[in-house]
Amino acid sequence: MGTEGKAGSKLLFLFTSMILGSLVQGKGSVYSPQTAVQVPENDSVKLPCIYSGFSSPRVEWKFVQGSTTALVCYNNQITVPYADRVTFSSSGITFSSVTRKDNGEYTCMVSEDGGQNYGEVSIHLTVLVPPSKPTVSIPSSVTIGNRAVLTCSEHDGSPPSEYSWFKDGVPMLTADAKKTRAFINSSYTIDPKSGDLVFDPVSAFDSGEYYCEAQNGYGTAMRSEAVRMEAVELNVGGIVAAVLVTLILLGLLIFGIWFAYSRGYFERTKKGTAPGKKVIYSQPSARSEGEFKQTSSFLV
């Protein structure tokens, strides 16, 4: 008998033992021959759930993805959000078409109407989606001796992609980088899960053209655009020149204020303004002293 025949016989023996044990003990059992299922996106798939020892089974299916929980099946009936693409049977549920949003854990829960008998089994569903072209963040120039972080990411691949980096077309090792002659003078680390490439510190040998690759074991590995990064020396001369120019300008400003003060410019400005005095203008009277003019007459 071949290996496949032995495995099939063993599975049949375990299933038969489970059924007989449940009948003897009067306790229900729930079982699935597949606790991890992988299927390409848009294909159909069945999640099997086999149970025994229940006189009146009540079946529910729960879906968990991160912090999100939803009921796919309640009391042997598919719920409304899944009714158009999921069917229920006594041996499991079948998706007519799956998307990457269906990734997660499905739990088949079987109980009696009275609630005294209960069993469950969980199945992890992975919807296979090839990675998309990753995007990178690579600085055009970095200062030698500083820390530099290059990032690579893509968000379509399922399962999540792992990342690798290349410099001038040469693969960068994720461990023991100095074993490669091209990187013997470089100090870097690569996190294949997050896609981060970290130089700490940057050396003059780190100048070059960098790109990354994303792959998840399904479909073709995808490559990012290549971007050149230059490792440059700290411009000490430029910093000194900037400080000197600033000091010269500050000195000229102080000299200008002193010169204006010594020439009395500020004193003349104070005298010219005389802020405490007010000038009042009045309209001349129509009659001045020594003159008499009849302005009106009255007749009685």
Swiss-Prot record:
User: Posttranslational modification, per the record?
Assistant: N-glycosylated.
Phosphoserine modifications at: 282, 285, 288
Gene Ontology BP terms: actomyosin structure organization; cell adhesion; cell differentiation; cell-cell adhesion; cellular response to mechanical stimulus; epithelial cell differentiation; establishment of endothelial intestinal barrier; intestinal absorption
Report the membrane topology from the UniProt record.
Single-pass type I membrane protein
Span-the-membrane segments of this chain are 239-259
Which InterPro entries is this protein grouped with? F11R, Ig-like_dom, Ig-like_dom_sf, Ig-like_fold, Ig_sub, Ig_sub2, Ig_V-set
Parts of the chain on the Extracellular side:
27-238
Which Gene3D superfamilies does UniProt cross-reference here?
Immunoglobulins
- Protein origin, superkingdom: Eukaryota
Ig-like V-type domain: residues covered: 28-122, 134-228
| Subcellular location(s) of the protein | Cell junction, Tight junction; Cell membrane
Q: What does the record give under GO molecular function?
A: integrin binding; PDZ domain binding; protein homodimerization activity
List cystine links: 49-108, 152-212
Q: Please classify the protein's predominant subcellular localization into one broad category.
A: other
Question: Which residues carry attached sugars according to the database record?
Answer: 185
Name the PANTHER family for this protein. JUNCTIONAL ADHESION MOLECULE A (PTHR45113:SF1)
Domain remark text: The Ig-like V-type 2 domain is necessary and sufficient for interaction with integrin alpha-L/beta-2.
Protein name as it appears in the record: Junctional adhesion molecule A
Lineage here is: Eukaryota, Metazoa, Chordata, Craniata, Vertebrata
